[in-house]
Amino acid sequence: MNQRIWINIALLVVIFVLSVIIFFNKHEIEDELLPLSSINPKSIININVQRKNLDNLFFSKSDGVWNMITPLQFQANRARIESILKILETKSYKQFNLDEVDIAQFALRSPAVILELNENKFSFGTNNPINQRRYILFDKKIHMIDDFHFPQLTTKAAYFAETKLLPDTMNIISIRFPEYTIQLNNGKWQASIPEYNEEKVKKIINKWKEIIAISVSKYEKQEGQKTITINSMSGQEINFAIVTTDPYLILGREDLGIQYNMGMDDAKQMFLKTYLKN
């Protein structure tokens, strides 16, 4: 090999070694960063989100279950609540004492969002234009953290709803569809349309027990919409409005103010006779 090739190989080796050193140094530095707080997420039972120009959100935990109390009332999605609580353990990349800075430069004099976890308050300011990390005020210090939480806290209330249509504890005894009914009769599942056997009906029941929506949005009532009514052994009754079937199935809970956007494959397995147009 000529000298130029050897020089190029040496340069590549140097670049590789430097990249490895930078990579591991970065991770060592991040490992040394302190968490934003020492608060145990499991100790939190109330979440209050005050939002400028948006509805405030309030969640409360009872018997291990999170529920939204305002502006809507429904069981909250556990994973999305846990995502909020992760702010307690997020890394603080930089801190400023309040007597060293003007909080106005961080847009913290009138925060866009104030998150209260029990009695602990986190005020959200602007983000850093270079690294896009967010400035927040907590425990009399301004911290710079990864900006994962602000977008979530400024989304619509329905985003936090549980995506599973029925509670795990619901023991179904009947489902009334617009044109037919399936119900438990003397320990056997039957349909009001006789061409369907018990095995087929059981599959429908099991699908409703486990079905999960792709997403949840604010309820939008439509004229002439039909209703699906589900009854349980305990006497509970849940009504789903068929908001639309085109281009995909949307089921509404008018009592909760939300609607479920269903996947096409799942939707086809929820009915004996399909309402889908595709």
Where are these regions (language model features)?
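A short-motif feature that recognizes glycine-rich, charge-decorated loops
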Residues: 1-278
